[in-house]
Amino acid sequence: MLIQYSWNDDRLRDIWNKLYTDNSYLFPFSSWEYTKEVCSYKKIKPTTLLQKEYIFVYYNHDVPLMIMPLFIKKKKLYIFGENISGPDNLDFIYDKNIRDEDIFLALKELKEKFHGIKLSLYKINERSRLYQFFRKFYQDDLLSDYRVTIDLDRVCVKICYQDNYDNYFHSLSKNARSNIHKVYNKLRKNNISIDLQVIHGAFKNEDLLSSLMKFYTKRESERKNRKFDFFSFIKHRYFSSLTWAIKNMDEQYTFCLMMNNKPAAFMTGFSTNFNEIVFPIVSMNSSFRDYSPGKVMINESIKYLQNHKLNLSLDLSRGDERYKFEMGGTKHYNYRISLEL
């Protein structure tokens, strides 16, 4: 049975937190804390003010098994969060042991409420139960009326390192190991000092955050051939649900590589229930491009995590740049799933 809730219902918050905390399938962008920031940002984004939202909880015998946070735009239903930039992964929030039968029954009830509307599920990771369900049944007679399509959305890269640094380093290719040696020798030869700053929890250093967002915006402008980046900086720094989450969430992690006391590269994101950190932002300061700051940052971050006994893989999320694979990265995928209700 589907029951509709409002965002300010304490019962919804409690159900949401319980399902999310117990489920390692889900990414931090599905957490209640992150969704709160999205809701706050939505209030200042004109294009979202008139979008109708629906939050349904699917119950089986009075047991809540799945939350379906949705909004409607131009006669299409989307997962809430798709209308705000920032999230790398979206999903329904469900019991980790939810059965295929329950997912089907929830979709059947949703179809009764929104018959003739297209449901567009974007940024669904391959480990999601939703992806597994649709991949299993999308050509089955069970879902023939839904006209399900599954398309690749984005390639992501994750680094799962060994239990100690020597094992990790020797797991890399000979060419990658040689390149790492060369860049560290170059740093020493040119008297470039390096230091890794790690911020875990709410990011309270406003000056450092501004500095990081400045070169993040500059790098973005270089990539997009944009002449002016002032307004983009203001947006990223002060009017972004992602930045607000970085400033407020306990699960936040930022690794910032300093070269000669200046930020050379940083990656910022959130820990998950899956022994990993997902980084929606990974950026390098182009002023230090000759010193491979991305590789050095990843290398120093892995040393830090191993020294602190934190067995957390690094999901570098957006983009499949070559240096990520040189540092031991492997691909995983996000998908777009569409169906007719």
Question: Which ranges hold each PLM region?
Answer:
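A conserved beta-strand-loop-helix scaffold within acyl/acetyltransferase catalytic domains
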Residues: 2-79, 124-133, 137, 145-156, ...
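Acyl-donor binding region in acyl/amide transferases
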Residues: 75-152, 274-331
